Amino acid sequence: EDALRRSVRELVADGAESFAVCLLWAFRNAEHEERVATICEEVAPGIPISLSHQIAPKMGEFERAVTTVINAYIGPLTQEYIGDLDRGLAADGLANSIQVITSTGGAARAANVGQQAVSIVNSGPVGGLVAARFLGDQLGHDKIITADMGGTSFDVGLIDGNTLEEDPRPFLDQGLPVTLPAVKLITIGAGGGSIAWTDGYRLHVGPQSAGANPGPAAY
């Protein structure tokens, strides 16, 4: 535990803004991860902590670790942004707390999204699939292909028989595996601003993007 305290101090000194904790068998017994979290809170109070047994309590330490790290990376910013939005809308008279669509096509309360930020990864294209299914139902179509093109990726989804297929092994468009329920999408790094680059003798496209200033909303 003394070594852990030293490591936490070093991370804070290096500018760490969030912690991700993933121990091998934590999905079966969370005691050690919870102890690590307690020590982190003692040494560095106020820094957000993502624990793998809370984020993705499944076998497969690599996928669980990646999922936890992604949550720790995007969690604080997501919580701040959605929290500001929720409070701003409430101040303008919105009676109910907002809900945010998730990668399963469902919705989560804004208050919970910051703790499980990874659950909204790829939720934009999934939201398009949900909307397409609704529209298809109104028009009498149950076989639909959707396409969602952004600045960094091109996402394709399929609706067959009015159902959304669950992805048994979801990956982000950067090739990172996540171990959470998600609607199946096929993603390629060919967005509107994707940059082609070489790494030795290999050609890559994205995920770097040239961006847009002003954005498409101003066109």
Which ranges hold each PLM region?
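N-terminally biased helix-coil "hinge/interface" segments that flank
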Residues: 1-219
